[in-house]
Amino acid sequence: MSRRNFKVLYVSGEVSPFVRISPLADFMASFPQAIEEEGFEARIMMPKYGTINDRKFRLHDVLRLSDIEVDLKEKVDLLNVKVTALPSSKIQTYFLYNEKYFKRNGLFTDIHNGSDLKGSTDKVVFFNVGVLETLQRLGWKPDIIHCHDWHAALIPLLLKTVYASHEFFRDIKTVFTIHNIYRQGILPMKAFQKLLPEEVSSALHCSNDEVNMLYTGVEHADLLTTTSKVYAEEIVHDGLQTYGLGRVLEEHQAKFYGILNGIDSRQWNSAADKLIKKRYSLEHMDGKLDNKKALLEEAGLPYTEGTPVVGVILNFDEFQGAELLQQSLEQLAALDIQLIISGSGDKKYEKVFQDFALEHPEQVSVHGEYSDSFFHLAIAGLDILLMPGMIESCGMIQMFAMNYGTIPVAYAGGGIVETIEERDEESGSGFIFHDYSAESLVGKLEEALACFHDEESWQQIVMTAMTRDFTWKKSAEEYDQLYRELLEP
């Protein structure tokens, strides 16, 4: 079978621009396109959340994919499917919908308040079983189902148990990618026992009457990946990074690979971006100042010539660095900067940041609601992107930023050290702090600010950043090889 005949289904809880909760959505927006360019046929399945605007994204019903029965042991629920093309591509994206499960804002985390939703078990089981039932009704058989994070972790086990005897699913391989090891999907075993046959529920990884979905995906997938080589090493060998999964990852190390993320340079191109105030390039950088002014206006902050604008774009939780950011606020406010904090999540952090902005109305702004337009404008308008997250499997935002001449200041770890060339006297594309503390973060930011005020040095670092190659080409070729090896008889 030639490579061009291979079919890959990507299953995820989020895909940008339809919904973005974490960097996984950015991955899903661009990686399937890169794989298609390698000669595969790619399709996507995700939940149809209540926040997804059918008209905006041109979703339409598929009559032959209506009223699909999803057997949840003690009940049968119906599934309907809508479809559209992933923007700027021909990749069919299927949205699985049932009002009872998906009408609320989020499937696993409420986008607006950040709290875990009650009853996530029935939602995740419905979604995972629904994916397989939809494939059967659709009659499109993938060679590989590539599952992302715990939201899709049940599919490899389902294929090896209740669906193993189905002719349609014979020989389908599974790949499971870990984007967020600290989000593992810990759910009550009793709920799974009510929804799944005994042969499935008994094979789930259970401890203290709780199921670990991420662990289950690791155990049963045919191939495991994560989003950088350094991160793969860290989560196998570094006890601080594994969050209880070190042993199972070490057991399956032979099938575990780290492949660095890339970005879609067509979507993230400052010279062609339709979502920013004014397009610009390395040869014509004047437009970046226009974007800076537009960003400040959007954020409700005054423009002051020569004052750097520093931005933080993150989920408000401890893993993404909200706690460290909170610890750093007073020191940041003492610097001659303007600070824009964009994100949502834990209400505790939201209140802290909003209160701090009220105390510093001319210097600090908090932007809560995610939108593609603000995200792109921020990447284009910021001078410096501050990344306080302790754990960064790879991240893509620092690559977006460097493409746009926005310089990252980030904590060392995972894909950060693979994507940011640390600044020294001669070269570099960003700044990295190695001690996870407020003092280290602020100290490294001060280094970046000193560079900013040295025009020649700043031009050099911006040029280095904007000429880095972050395209998916190399990573897609690595996945191409892994996929083909997995499918060899």
UniProtKB/Swiss-Prot annotation:
It catalyses: [(1->4)-alpha-D-glucosyl](n) + ADP-alpha-D-glucose = [(1->4)-alpha-D-glucosyl](n+1) + ADP + H(+). The keyword Iron-sulfur does not apply. Keywords: Glycogen biosynthesis, Glycosyltransferase, Transferase. Gene3D superfamilies: Glycogen Phosphorylase B. NCBIfam families: glgA, PRK14098.1. Belongs to the glycosyltransferase 1 family. Bacterial/plant glycogen synthase subfamily. Synthesizes alpha-1,4-glucan chains using ADP-glucose. This is Glycogen synthase. The gene is glgA.
